[in-house]
Every structure is written in C-alpha cells, then in structure tokens.
Amino acid sequence: MGGDDAPEVPVRAALSALTDGPEDLSILLVGDPDRLEPAVRDAGQPPERLRIVPAPQTIAMNEPPVQAVRRKPESSIVVGLRLQREGEADAFVSAGSTGAVLAASLFVLGRLPGVDRPTVGALFPTADRPVLVLDAGANVGCRPAHLHQFAHLGNIYVRDLWGVEVPRVGLLNVGEEEEKGDDLAVATHELLREDPELRFVGNVEGHRIIEGRCDVLVCDGFLGNVLLKFYESMAGFIVGLLRREQAQAGGRSREPGPVERMLDYTEYGGAPLLGVDGVVVLCHGSSPPRAIRNALSVAVDSVRADMVSDLGRDLEALSNRTRRGEM
C-alpha cells in the first residue's frame, strides 16, 4: 500500500478494477489492516474478490532501499512479492518506493535465467503508438550486453502486450550513423545489428523519438531517466499551456482533448519491471486512481499473455547463443 496518498488512492483503484475489470480478477490489498479497512469501507461496498493481507511494516520513500528491504521483511512491498513467489498472487503492482520494489523483486523473485540486470521501462507517446524506453533509471553504468538484453526484454513485452508481431528496436544515440556515439553506443549498435532475432532499425536521435520510428528504444539508465524526467516536465508544461489557453478563450469544457490525453501518463498505467521471475508493475508515488487502475490492467494483460515465460525462454536462448560465440 505505497504511494503519496495511500491507502485511499490504491483502494479506490482496486475497487474500480474489480467493478469494471474481468470477472475472474481478484485483488489482495497488502498493508496495515487498521488503515486499509476504513479506506475500503469509505470507498464503497467491498466486493468478495477483495482481500486484505496484513503487512505491519512500511518502507518510506527516503529510506535506503536495500537496507530497508532487509530490515523490514513484513513491509507491504516484501509481503506482496512473497505472495507472488508462493503462488498466492500472479502479479504485483505498487506505487511505493521504486528502489525498494527493485531491491525486493531481486531478493524475493530473483532474476530470470540469462538476465544480468532487470530493467524498468517507461512509455513515451509518439505520433503512432507509444514507444517503450529501456532502461528508465534502474541501471546506470551499463555494458553493451546489458543493453542487448534490454532490447530482447522490450521486444517480447511489446509483442506479447501490444500485439506487434515484429517490434522495431532502436538505439538512442547522438546521430543516426552507426559509428556515432561513445564506445557503449558503438558496441551496442553492432550487437543489435548482428542479432537475427531483432528487427533493429538503427540509431534514433532524441528529436526523432516522437515520430514513432521504433517500438522499443534502448539506452543506459542514466540517459533514460534524464529523458523520462524531461518528458514528464515538458508534458506537464504543455498541458498547463493548453488549459490556460482554453480558459482565456472562455472554454468551459473540462474534458481533456486528444493532445492532453496523449501526454497524460495516467493513460499508460505503470512501468514494467522486466527480467525478474514475476510480473511487477511500478507506479508513480503521486499516481491518481486512474493510473493505478490502468497499471492493474497492464498486470492482468501480462499474466494472461504468459509474458514471464516468454521472457525467460528468449533470454535463456540469447545467453546460450552468447556462450557458444554466436553473438
């Protein structure tokens, strides 16, 4: 039960998902029952498919993630992931501390075979459909092999969840020519270009992202997080301008227009954590109910698509090819 407005916002999101979502969906709310039970009562009649699982400890946003996870085995993050590992849950969604979720996912679920570093994705709107950017901040100081794995993880995610049969994979770089960029970019470009399992479309410059040139865009987590934070601030700036312009023109409609909807991160739900042995979806700490509700949909779709099994098979095959010297 993490997030800036927990437990009220996650509870409202859960009830909305159970009301409007698939009939076979059930949700476990993990946290302090003394706080969760009143929030559930205040939000409306709780359905039978909602259950509260006690977790008396809480990890604050400013706590060192690894130490907090080790010191607090009964925190909602650790308990929730343990439920998935033990088969009582199929997925885990959290608006709590991103670092704590990452650390706990590694401790509790572990990595998939062949995965060196799990990666966090971020969805960016484009002129066509969203692009999945990997890594968005979980991994700083990557090697070419890490970015190669990110490309495979993103490739399977986009194929399974978006129905794109052969996703286009791009490499974020300072120029389109294959010799452009630092040593990491040049070496990664060669790996992606020579991989017959990927539809590599080459280097993608920052100003080309919104053109929809690729479905998966790989980069180091430092660069990806800077890109993410800039996009979030610019999207908020543009939405603010649109609303101010509407108000000055005497507009009264509060319905968001197509541009505002496209820039609204709540449209896309949460960010997937790919490469761990389970379904984990991360939400903004400030997420409103709608964003968490959409993140729950992402989790459901991931489970139905058996995405984790597909990721495991693909990354294990990549690891075997690498060991045989085929990459």
Label each residue range with its predicted role.
Residues L29-G31, R51-V53, S94-G96, L123-P125, ...:
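Short beta-strand segments
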Residues L106-V133, E211-L217, G221-M327:
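Glycine-rich phosphate/nucleotide-binding loop
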Residues Q45-A89:
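Phosphate/nucleotide-donor binding subsite
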Residues M1-E8, A138-H148, L282-P289:
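Short, glycine-rich nucleotide/cofactor-binding loops
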Residues T19-P22, G44-P46, V69-P73, L83-G87, ...:
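Solvent-exposed alpha-helices and their adjacent loops that cap or buttress functional pockets
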Residues E8-V9, G21-L28, P33-E37, A43, ...:
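Glycine-rich phosphate/diphosphate-binding loop of Rossmann-like nucleotide-binding domains
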Residues R49-L50, V131, L198:
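Short, conserved active-site loop motifs that form the nucleotide-linked donor/cofactor pocket
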